[in-house]
Amino acid sequence: MRTFVRIVEAGSLSAAARQLATTQATVSRRLQSLETMLGVRLILRTTHTTRLTDDGERCYQHARRVIDSWLALEDEVGQTEDEPVGVLRVRAPHAFGQDQLLKPVTEFLQRYPQLSIEWMLNDRSADFLGDNLDCAIRVGVEVDPATVSVLLAEVPRSVVASPALLARFPAVTTPEDLQQFPWIAISSFYQRHVELFHDASPATARIAITPRLSTDSLYVARNTALTGLGVAVVSSWTVQDDIQEGRLVHLLPEWQPAALPVHLVYPWSRYYPARLRRFLELMRQVMPEVTGMRKPVQQP
């Protein structure tokens, strides 16, 4: 049954075999045994795809509940102190996942010796079933109603440009002046316009921009801004030293882009294992203190 569930959630027999550390032939035999025992075809297979039959869909829903219940029993009976065990599969953004979050994650693993973590860096939205993920740390607004999103922190942002670029244009004194510049867009967060908020009044400004370069990488945006290619909106922590040392200029500091929310996201379930619950507790505790983040501003 667990093999069948893993096939469904991994998306193919070969992917399930890799995750289970076994051969595709073994996975296929287990699936055939389950289908023979139930007397129905659960998965339709072609050379390139697999898909659930109607019976397979019903079987998967029941099997998922049975496995969740069994895991809950294991936690309750086998771990009297609710200590996390097993493997936690986490997706984190490149910018934070390769640096600032490593220390708390390492300490977390040292605290729980029976736990392992698969720490995968990717800035795309999480496909929990296809990638077999337990949770994901996401920067930006989450709108998937099938998931639980826990707000952990927020990331302040700044508008920056190089002195060489600024020397080619009239001085910037209002948000509208930014429209004259070439731009570097971070496609995950802004592409054709930038919205700014005044820090001492309710005033807002929506600026149309013309990107010379669009990227999904925060580091690419920062590095190309340093070359003078264009103006960019970036996470403030990535350019703090550049601003202090004069490599970049913080434009209109009284006008700020909205800070980006940081969530821990995971699929809704009737049961959450101790490893996920403890990791959520850790992230709630450490995330607002991570370099470049702050506690979320309470909304009115």
Predicted regions and their residues:
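Central regulatory/effector-binding core of bacterial HTH transcription factors
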Residues: 85-148, 296-300
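C-terminal regulatory
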Residues: 127-130, 142-262, 289-300
